[in-house]
């Protein structure tokens, strides 16, 4: 945090160009009588007690002097970007810690953003996190300087090695953050990977239809239970929780499938989908096989990166906390949770895989392609035999509200 700290002056010192210079003409203040107890002086006291003449003359040590007025004025300076309380002058302008950190991060990482509206979004305390494009645009418009970020020295509150800065500027120790946040993500898993089923860990083993359906049910239930127990998610409004899971359940399912090395052989998947039960055109078979191929590709690409459990947990949190869900009551808060998860993953990868500088980027690049796996196809392949025509969104809502007491309509998970 860049703070403006005024150096302390003795009230008897002359202040050129101000009325404070009159203080030197005031009659000397008599010292304490002999034998009086000695009182230690502090910078706040500024030496002997101020006389009324000194106070009126503008001694900076007094509560009513111009130094105090200047400090009070500084405390009321607003951030030129969002209007929040300014913490000082950063990169050429008075800004809050949030806008300072956002501008610094955007410039140092050379980030580019896209506006989903008309590139004229309101940027204030309540909307500053909703459009990064317009926020950066306003930072530059009000005069924040890119070159000040590139050439400026590291401010005192810049996170050093072993620290991690949240978007509100509060530094946290990196290791305590990882051991806290990521460990909670890991502990939220209702099933360790090995408990998804022994067959799941044998990629070459062709699973039967019933085993495939049961494994899929476990993975979907695991995704919802995990979300219910991770930090911050239970604090969201229940409508927001449902909206987030309805949008992201299929992506979480693919990540779980990759994590447990779920076998994805075409024949049993087609059988599980019930496509053999009724005549179908060749085009429909080809279309389903193409969807299965896409699913297989996404799983294999994740497996090729040898993603560890902590990375999977962070990836799932990044996927879950998306502002793309419809009807969210607090979009900015959800975005901040996604950013925390992303930053935690970045710090973890840097500390655990220092010899793989591109690993973090490769992991993030896998996330957008998860949506290429159709959620309706996942329903058809894995859940029709279990729930029939019951919408998967209904099951997710029931799982979220029922918790561990949830039972499948047609098959209980043992």
Curated annotation (Swiss-Prot):
Sequence ranges of Pro residues compositional bias: 27-37
Entry-annotated residues carrying Phosphothreonine: 51
Zn-finger region bounds: NR C4-type: 79-99, 115-139
PROSITE patterns: NR_LBD, NUCLEAR_REC_DBD_1, NUCLEAR_REC_DBD_2
Effect of residue 398 to R: Reduces transcription activation by 40%
Residue ranges of coiled coil: none
Gene3D superfamilies, per the entry: Erythroid Transcription Factor GATA-1, subunit A, Retinoid X Receptor
Annotated stretches, region: Important for dimerization: 337-414
Any one of the GO CC terms: nucleus
Effect of residue 250 to A: Reduces transcription activation by 50%
Biased composition (Gly residues): 58-67
Subunit structure: Interacts with SQSTM1. Binds DNA as a dimer; homodimer or heterodimer with NR2F6. Interacts with NCOA1, NCOA2, NCOA3 and PPARGC1A. Interacts with ZFPM2.
UniProt-listed PANTHER family: NUCLEAR HORMONE RECEPTOR
Record's function text: Ligand-activated transcription factor. Activated by high concentrations of 9-cis-retinoic acid and all-trans-retinoic acid, but not by dexamethasone, cortisol or progesterone (in vitro). Regulation of the apolipoprotein A-I gene transcription. Binds to DNA site A. May be required to establish ovary identity during early gonad development.
Protein name: COUP transcription factor 2
Organism, scientific name: Homo sapiens (Human)
């Amino acid at each position: 945090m860049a703070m403006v700290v005024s150096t302390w002056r003795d009230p008897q010192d002359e202040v050129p160009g101000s009325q404070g210079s009159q203080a030197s003409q005031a009659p000397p203040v008599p010292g304490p009588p002999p034998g009086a107890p000695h009182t230690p002086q502090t910078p706040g006291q500024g030496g002997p007690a101020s006389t009324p003449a000194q106070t009126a003359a503008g001694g900076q040590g007094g509560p009513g002097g111009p130094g105090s007025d200047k400090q009070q004025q500084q405390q009321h300076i607003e951030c030129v970007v969002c209007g929040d309380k300014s913490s000082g002058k950063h990169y050429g302008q008075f800004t809050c810690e949030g806008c300072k950190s956002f501008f610094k991060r955007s410039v140092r990482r050379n980030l580019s953003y896209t506006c989903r509206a008309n590139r004229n979004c309101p940027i204030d305390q309540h909307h500053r996190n909703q459009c990064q494009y317009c926020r950066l645009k306003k930072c530059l418009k009000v005069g924040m300087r890119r070159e000040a970020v590139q050439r400026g020295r590291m401010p005192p509150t810049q996170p050093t090695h072993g620290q991690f800065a949240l978007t509100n500027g509060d530094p946290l120790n990196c290791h305590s953050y990882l051991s806290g946040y990521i460990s909670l993500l890991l502990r939220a898993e209702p099933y360790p990977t090995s408990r998804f089923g022994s067959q799941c860990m044998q990629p070459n083993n062709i699973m039967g239809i019933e085993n495939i359906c049961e494994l899929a049910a476990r993975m979907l239930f695991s995704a919802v239970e995990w979300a219910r127990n991770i930090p911050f998610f239970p604090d969201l409004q229940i409508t927001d929780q449902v909206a987030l899971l309805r949008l992201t359940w299929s992506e979480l399912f693919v990540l779980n499938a990759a994590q447990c090395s779920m076998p994805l052989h075409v024949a049993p998947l087609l059988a599980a989908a019930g496509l053999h039960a009724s005549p179908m055109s060749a085009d429909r078979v080809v279309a389903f096989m193409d969807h299965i191929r896409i699913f297989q590709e996404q799983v294999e690409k994740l497996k090729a990166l040898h993603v560890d459990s902590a990375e999977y947990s962070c990836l799932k949190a990044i996927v879950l906390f998306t502002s793309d869900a419809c009807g969210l009551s607090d979009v900015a808060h959800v975005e901040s949770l996604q950013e925390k998860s992303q930053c935690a993953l970045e710090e973890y990868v840097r500390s655990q895989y220092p010899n793989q500088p591109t690993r973090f980027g490769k992991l993030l690049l896998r996330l957008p392609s998860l949506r290429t796996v159709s959620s309706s196809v996942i329903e058809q392949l894995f859940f029709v035999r279990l729930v029939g025509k019951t919408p998967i969104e209904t099951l997710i809502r029931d799982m979220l509200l029922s918790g561990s007491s949830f039972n499948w309509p047609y098959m209980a998970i043992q």
